Amino acid sequence: MSSDIQQIRIGLTNNHPCSYLADRMERVAVAIDPQMQTPETYEVLMANGFRRSGDTIYKPHCDHCQSCQALRIPAPDFVPSKSQKRLLKLLSQEFHWQLKPELDEDWYALYARYIFARHRHGSMYPPNKMEFAKFARAKWLNTQYLHLYQGEKLVAIAVTDLLPNSASAFYTFYDPDISISLGTLAVLCQLNYCQQTKKQWLYLGYQIDECPAMNYKVRFNPHQRLVNQRWRG
């Protein structure tokens, strides 16, 4: 970290029930200096375990839990597994993707179906256009929407932050009625983008081993986890 970033002011939230582990309490550290809100600085902060929600930059700071570990993939070194190779073959045959600065007009119907089917008991329920916009956008970042199509049909959107030397998989939603792993396919598209544009890293957010819904992340290899402020893997 640079000396400027070492001196950032941090605010701590109160403890509240964890969104992922039912028996835990969570608390986050929030970077409260507006000058931290630049793509270059945020990229350094991500390398030190921070993420964003809207314009807010934060990092888990729980009293008795270290389960959240930032995870990233070195894009040039990625080697797909057998199942990922099958998805890549499908991608070349049936699907195509496109990065766009704005959402397609029919995005909300897809998003609402996804939330109703997969996250009815989560913090995003009930789906709301304005709340999603506040959550997904940051005024100071180049955020793009990776649209995944099956033929002409929109089947997934991956909100993707573009940084100078990396990309960040921020949030993905998809058609809940399609049986193939659209979430994994979206990450493969993001890795494809990183390789095309010679970006070093794709950040996948936090990995929590006790949370089965997150286990898809560790299937991308090689990957690194931030453990005790050191990237390992």
Curated annotation (Swiss-Prot):
Record keywords: Acyltransferase, Cytoplasm, Transferase
Keyword Acyltransferase: yes
The protein's Enzyme Commission number: 2.3.2.29
InterPro entries the record matches: Acyl_CoA_acyltransferase, Asp_Glu_LeuTrfase, N-end_Aminoacyl_Trfase, N-end_Aminoacyl_Trfase_C, N-end_Aminoacyl_Trfase_N
GO molecular function: arginyl-tRNA--protein transferase activity; leucyl-tRNA--protein transferase activity
One GO biological process term: ubiquitin-dependent protein catabolic process via the N-end rule pathway
Coiled-coil features, chain-numbered ranges: none
Reaction equation(s) it catalyzes: N-terminal L-glutamyl-[protein] + L-leucyl-tRNA(Leu) = N-terminal L-leucyl-L-glutamyl-[protein] + tRNA(Leu) + H(+); N-terminal L-aspartyl-[protein] + L-leucyl-tRNA(Leu) = N-terminal L-leucyl-L-aspartyl-[protein] + tRNA(Leu) + H(+)
Cellular localization per UniProt: Cytoplasm
Annotated GO CC locations: cytoplasm
NCBIfam families, alphabetized: PRK01305.1-3, PRK01305.2-2, PRK01305.2-3
Stated family: Belongs to the R-transferase family. Bpt subfamily.
Function: Functions in the N-end rule pathway of protein degradation where it conjugates Leu from its aminoacyl-tRNA to the N-termini of proteins containing an N-terminal aspartate or glutamate.
HAMAP family: Bpt (MF_00689)
Name the record gives this protein: Aspartate/glutamate leucyltransferase
Biological source species: Vibrio cholerae serotype O1 (strain ATCC 39541 / Classical Ogawa 395 / O395)
